[in-house]
Regions:
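Single conserved hydrophobic/aromatic residue that forms the stacking wall/gate
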Residues: 1-11
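Short coil/turn connectors at secondary-structure junctions
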Residues: 12, 37, 66-68, 172-175
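Boundary/entry segment of secreted carbohydrate-active catalytic domains
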Residues: 12-24
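N-terminal glycine-rich anion-binding loops that anchor highly charged ligand groups
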Residues: 24-41
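A general structural detector for well-ordered alpha-helical segments in enzyme core domains, enriched
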Residues: 27-31, 56-60, 119, 162, ...
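Enzymes and membrane/adaptor proteins characterized by extended Gly/Ser/Thr/Asp/Glu-rich
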Residues: 36-158, 181, 186-200
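Phosphate/pyrophosphate-binding betaalpha-module
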Residues: 162, 166-181, 189-192
Length: 200
């Protein structure tokens, strides 16, 4: 709406946007060339096959004339996975890794290292260079389950520690990260995708 009111210059390159399908439409190409977003985020609706996704990410970089264009994805594992067509990591929720960290830190480090390496390899293969992890929301009782098993723990020290490890491991595997959620889903009583949460 702001862009259509002539404020495009102010917001140019200050935003991330998504696209509609498996390939770019003429309208989307025109929009991207005009407003030059900072990055593009992909969702399940954009991913069909490995080759198709590779062509899509290559097209985005070519159109925006940026070989290092930030191309983002939500690949948390568990119920938030955009790459289900290629991998099944439904078991590997953040809660799974948080519980494992509490029980056996050595096993956690081994499992988490292998997990991050596999996800990073697939992302690089697809031409994706940013994963929107880690989720740093603290799990709280009797609130909306938009977070739930997406949180590492109800213990803020564990969330912080695993968050640091997650960032470090992805960076070592050449994938940038974006922490979330800000200001935080942990205290939300409603799903912010559907309603506006009010946090006291």
């Amino acid at each position: 709406r702001l862009l259509s009111r002539g404020l495009g210059d102010v917001y140019k390159r200050q935003f991330i946007c998504g696209i509609k399908g498996y390939k770019l439409s003429k309208t989307e190409i025109k929009f991207l060339r005009k407003y030059k977003p900072w990055g593009i985020i992909l969702f399940s609706r954009n991913i069909k096959t490995i080759k198709q996704t590779q062509l899509l990410t290559k097209s985005l970089k070519n159109i925006l004339q940026n070989p290092t264009l930030p191309i983002l994805i939500d690949e948390e594992g568990g119920r938030v996975s955009r790459l289900r067509k290629f991998i099944d990591n439904s078991v590997f929720t953040n809660k799974y890794f948080g519980d494992l960290y509490k029980k056996d830190k050595k096993k956690f480090n081994l499992y988490f290292d292998v997990y991050v390496k596999q996800i990073s390899y697939l992302l690089r293969l697809l031409g994706i260079n940013v994963n929107t992890v880690p989720v740093l929301d603290i799990l709280r009782k009797n609130l909306h389950q938009i977070v739930g098993d997406r949180s590492f723990s109800s213990n803020k020290k564990i969330v912080s520690k695993i968050g640091d490890i997650c960032i470090d491991k992805f960076h070592k595997n050449k994938i940038a990260t974006i922490t979330k959620h800000i200001p935080g889903h942990g205290l939300a009583k409603v799903d912010s995708h559907l309603k506006l949460p009010i946090i006291d």
